[in-house]
């Protein structure tokens, strides 16, 4: 086995049984990986120096093809209602077949770290078949320095082989695509997909399993910090404004997607960003756009014109076009990836029913309720002429990546909020003056003004009213914001229609929360929206 690159000589890849007749390249940097990816025909150079690759059939994650090993250790710990199981024997067969498949391949190895807190970090070795995947994960995770590489011992190992094809009869998979996670041995096998995001989310899944045992809250959120050291976290599902609202030139960006909240404060799990690029423009998001114009960034499924210039408006391959770049490509990004305990927790929703206020203050119990609910609303495809919004509930704002029961994460969050006195806010970036199709989108200027008032502490000193439907507190007046939008009912021309819509949404919350009722206490149940008042 031929091996090149900086590494710990006492820790080769054959320690997990992986041997190959090909070349193993350890910890190559961007320039060398560019050369490899282009030489092998995996990727192309853009006119501005970024690397662009296509993922073929899989242009997003394959959640239905993800499996967790059900063994004696994970049996009582994993939320099996939400995680598909494979047996240890099936995993062993799959693992052996992965090793056999890799036995004649050139491989790329990156020794990286998940978690910017030195006491809680997860040293992770990522072994890939593609050079561009190696650069992708090098951009996304935290890179040790040369001295640390010489001593590096991985705790987690990912083997990523897009050319592998799983056999459902032999491996217990659903299709030829498989993401198999052994939480006990901390091994992840990814086969039959070239979508690079699977690697990133595998590390997130592992940290989501490990950290709660240490009293640390893993969070699917963005985070930033003000000049006075006041940190804020932003929970939110796709399309709610998580990336946009946390990108604030007056605040330091800690990270855009995955964080932990531990004894020393919050910390980024990653060292990079994986941003959506569909319809990306220099005017709307200048910092993200600038990263796509430089050497080192990986573009995924982005179409190039004849001159090699990315066309971010072209979604012919997928609407889920992406760019992956190191965090230090963003001018106001944190150099440490760490911040103090958050002073403010923001839960974002895009309520297309037009019922929720633009901002509301939550008690710790209400925060747990809304965290477990993970509500937003999707707008139906206008091409079908359907204008009815569709409620979406993704518990913990990230159900696909949570191996444990949601109540574990919810209780942890509630305890941390209470012990550190964080203020919690629900921010609605959805519709006002009516539902989708009748009302209009909440003005971003108003959302930013409300957010600024929440983060600088001025909002909580003002006057609040209690919302009749949801029971949370809503500000009555905020400087620079039209007071009318603070009371959603007043913005509707048809008040009885608002009441019916509110009752309907409250009912959806209640039905969704039924599965959590056995796992929460009376205080959290008391924080639920009030069906009777809403229906009156």
Swiss-Prot record:
GO terms classed as biological process: gluconeogenesis
Major place of residence: cytoplasm
Catalyzed reactions: oxaloacetate + ATP = phosphoenolpyruvate + ADP + CO2
CDD domains: PEPCK_ATP
GO cellular component, one term: cytosol
Cofactor(s) required for function per UniProt: Mn(2+)
Annotated pathway: Carbohydrate biosynthesis; gluconeogenesis
Residues noted as binding substrate in the record, renumbered to the chain: 61, 195, 201, 322
Nuclease is among the record's keywords: no
PROSITE patterns assigned: PEPCK_ATP
UniProt binding sites for ATP: 201, 220, 236-244, 285, 322, 447
Coiled-coil blocks: none
InterPro entries for the chain: PEP_carboxykinase_ATP, PEP_carboxykinase_C, PEP_carboxykinase_N, PEPCK_ATP_CS
Role: Involved in the gluconeogenesis. Catalyzes the conversion of oxaloacetate (OAA) to phosphoenolpyruvate (PEP) through direct phosphoryl transfer between the nucleoside triphosphate and OAA.
Family annotation (NCBIfam families): pckA, PRK09344.1-2, PRK09344.1-3, PRK09344.1-4
HAMAP family (UniProt xref): PEPCK_ATP
PANTHER family linked to this entry: PHOSPHOENOLPYRUVATE CARBOXYKINASE (ATP), PHOSPHOENOLPYRUVATE CARBOXYKINASE ATP
Recorded family membership: Belongs to the phosphoenolpyruvate carboxykinase (ATP) family.
Protein name: Phosphoenolpyruvate carboxykinase (ATP)
The organism of origin for this protein: Mesorhizobium japonicum (strain LMG 29417 / CECT 9101 / MAFF 303099) (Mesorhizobium loti (strain MAFF 303099))
Gene (UniProt): pckA
């Amino acid at each position: 086995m031929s091996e090149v690159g900086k590494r710990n000589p006492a820790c080769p890849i054959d320690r997990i049984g992986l041997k190959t007749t090909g070349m193993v390249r350890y910890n190559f940097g961007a320039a060398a990986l560019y050369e490899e990816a282009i030489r092998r025909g995996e990727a192309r150079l853009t006119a501005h120096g970024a690397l662009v690759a296509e993922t073929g059939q899989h242009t997003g994650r394959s959640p239905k093809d993800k499996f967790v090993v059900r063994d004696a250790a994970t049996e009582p710990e994993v939320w099996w209602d939400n995680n598909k199981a494979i047996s240890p024997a099936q995993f062993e067969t799959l693992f052996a077949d992965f090793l056999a498949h890799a036995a004649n391949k050139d491989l790329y190895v990156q020794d990286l770290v998940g978690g910017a807190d030195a006491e809680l970090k997860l040293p992770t070795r990522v072994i890939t078949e593609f050079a561009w995947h190696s650069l992708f994960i090098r951009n996304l995770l935290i890179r040790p320095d040369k001295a640390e590489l010489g001593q590096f011992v991985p705790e987690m190992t990912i083997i990523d082989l897009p050319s592998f094809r799983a056999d459902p009869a032999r491996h217990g998979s659903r299709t030829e695509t498989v993401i198999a996670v052994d939480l006990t041995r901390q091994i992840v096998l990814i086969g039959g997909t070239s979508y690079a995001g699977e690697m990133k989310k595998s590390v997130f899944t592992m940290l989501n399993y490990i950290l709660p045992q240490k009293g640390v809250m893993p969070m699917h959120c963005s985070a930033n910090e003000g000049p006075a050291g006041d940190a804020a976290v932003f929970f939110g599902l796709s399309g709610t404004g998580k990336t946009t609202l946390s990108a604030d030139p007056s605040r330091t960006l800690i990270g855009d997607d995955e964080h932990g909240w531990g004894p020393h404060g919050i910390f980024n799990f990653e060292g990079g960003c994986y941003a959506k690029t569909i319809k990306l423009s220099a005017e709307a998001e200048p910092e993200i756009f600038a990263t796509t114009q430089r050497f080192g960034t990986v573009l995924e499924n982005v179409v190039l014109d004849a001159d090699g210039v990315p066309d971010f408006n072209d979604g012919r391959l997928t609407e889920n076009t992406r760019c992956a770049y190191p965090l230090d490509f963003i001018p106001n990004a944190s150099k440490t990836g760490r911040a103090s305990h958050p002073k403010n927790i923001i839960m974002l929703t895009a309520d297309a029913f037009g019922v929720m206020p633009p901002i509301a203050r939550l008690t710790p119990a209400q925060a747990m309720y809304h965290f477990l609910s993970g509500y937003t609303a999707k707008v139906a495809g206008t091409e079908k002429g359907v204008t009815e919004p569709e409620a979406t509930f993704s518990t913990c704002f990230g159900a696909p990546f949570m191996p444990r029961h949601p109540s574990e994460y919810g209780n942890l969050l509630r305890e941390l909020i209470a012990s550190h006195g964080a203020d919690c806010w629900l921010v609605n970036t959805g519709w006002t003056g009516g539902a989708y199709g009748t009302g209009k989108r909440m003005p971003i200027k108003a959302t930013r003004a409300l957010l600024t008032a929440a983060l600088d502490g001025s909002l909580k000193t003002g006057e609040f009213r209690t919302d009749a439907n949801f029971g949370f507190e809503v500000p009555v007046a905020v400087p620079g914001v039209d007071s009318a939008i603070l009371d959603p009912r007043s913005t509707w021309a048809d008040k009885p229609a608002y009441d019916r819509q509110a009752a309907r949404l409250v009912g959806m919350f209640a039905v969704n929360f039924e599965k959590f009722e056995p796992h929460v206490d009376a205080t959290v149940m008391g924080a639920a929206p009030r069906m009777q008042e809403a229906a009156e």
